[in-house]
From Swiss-Prot:
Belongs to the glycosyl hydrolase 3 family. NagZ subfamily. One of its GO terms (molecular function) is beta-N-acetylhexosaminidase activity. It is found in: Cytoplasm. It comes from Edwardsiella ictaluri (strain 93-146). Pathway: Cell wall biogenesis; peptidoglycan recycling. Its EC number is 3.2.1.52. It comes from the Bacteria. The record marks 174 as: Important for catalytic activity. It catalyses: Hydrolysis of terminal non-reducing N-acetyl-D-hexosamine residues in N-acetyl-beta-D-hexosaminides. The gene is nagZ. This is Beta-hexosaminidase. Substrate binds at residues 62, 70, 133, 163-164. Its main location: cytoplasm. Keywords: Cell cycle, Cell division, Cell shape, Cell wall biogenesis/degradation, Cytoplasm, Glycosidase, Hydrolase, Peptidoglycan synthesis.
Length: 340
């Protein structure tokens, strides 16, 4: 599979998109809310994407739950990660997290979507970019919830992507708008933020990792997403991670310090990413395809979904009905708690 993941504009493909998707460097597509009208339309769009590519690619989405859920009508309203621990006993929180990962993955696989970029492994709720997307502020409480969520995804046949390595939760700035700088001592990041990544990787739960567009100034002057130190020395060598490394979206302002779109993509791949995301800027994506010097990684193909999910059969199953009811209720309780 090629090393570039990009987006499409609407509910169906246009002629230029069909041509772009057939480019040998394109290995994936990420979908957004603007691509969704209803489940039938979404399933047809995914079919068009796979047909246009004429080579294997990943179809992906951010369907985390809470404020980051791209598809709503016809899908379960998933609770925010923070709500699992905030409103339940530890045992019930883990049960619900497992069902949340399973149900989310099943609903996406029924659309022939390979991957939802989840779960968020950042610690703490103070970051503008993270907030309720994090399970907990402490690793010892977040780890069992993240592990349960991943176990649910794996039961459904979907691989898990931990984000945003080595941890985005302690910077208040939003990397969508600027490049955050985390000036904490390196030992603090290693012994706090990275614990969840290290633990989940050691027990074989992480299939992919997405680094942060954050500069950890005590370690490197480059964002982690373009840093050989973080991706090769720490992630690959020290942690022994063998899965796929995705860049976060290179159109985010947090990546702008790496140069033009083509320079950002090349820097990320040279640093150790297997695949780069270039979203919401057609000319930027074309520039990357025109100038990139890179081959696809064989690791990427491992992330294709392995599930066989019929949507009607899924929604008729006892497990889906119970999980749907429990998760919708948790979502509603969380929204009410935030208003209190």
């Amino acid at each position: 599979m090629g090393p570039v993941m990009l987006d499409v504009v609407g509910h169906e493909l246009d002629a230029e998109e069909r041509e772009i998707l057939d480019h040998p460097l394109v290995g994936g597509v990420i979908l957004f809310s603007r691509n969704f009208d209803d489940p039938a339309q979404l399933r047809e769009l995914v079919r068009q994407i796979r047909q246009a590519a004429r080579h294997p690619l990943l179809v992906t989405v951010d369907q985390e739950g809470g404020r980051v859920q791209r598809f709503h009508q016809g899908f379960t309203r998933l609770p925010a990660a923070q709500s699992y621990a905030a409103l339940n006993t530890p045992q019930e929180a883990q049960r619900l997290a497992l069902e949340g990962g399973w149900l989310m993955a099943c609903e996406m696989i029924a659309m022939d979507i390979d991957l939802s970029f989840a779960p968020v492994l950042d610690l703490g709720h103070g970051s503008a970019a993270i907030g309720e997307r994090a399970f907990h502020r402490e690793a010892e409480s977040a780890i069992p919830l993240a592990q349960a969520f991943i176990d649910g995804m794996h039961q459904a046949g979907m691989k898990a992507t931990g984000k945003h390595f080595p941890g985005h939760g302690k910077v208040s700035a939003d990397s969508h708008k600027e490049t955050p700088i985390d000036a904490r001592p390196l030992v603090q990041i290693v012994e706090h933020d990275m614990v969840i990544f290290r633990t989940l990787n050691a027990c074989g739960k992480l299939d992919a990792v997405m680094p942060a567009h954050v500069i950890y100034s005590q370690a490197d002057s480059r964002p982690a997403s373009g840093s050989p130190y973080w991706l090769q020395q720490v992630l690959r060598q020290t942690l022994g991670f063998e899965g796929v490394v995705f860049s976060d979206d290179l159109s985010m302002n947090g990546a702008a310090v790496m140069g033009s779109y083509a320079q950002r993509a090349q820097a990320s791949l040279d640093a150790g990413c297997d695949m780069v995301l270039v979203c919401n800027n057609r000319q930027g994506a074309i520039s990357v395809l025109d100038h990139l010097s890179a081959a696809g990684s064989p690791r990427i193909a491992r992330l294709r979904h392995r599930g066989q999910v019929d949507r009607e059969g899924l929604m008729g199953s006892a497990r889906w009905k119970q999980a749907h009811q429990d998760l919708q209720r948790l979502h509603q309780r969380w929204e009410e708690a935030k208003q209190a």
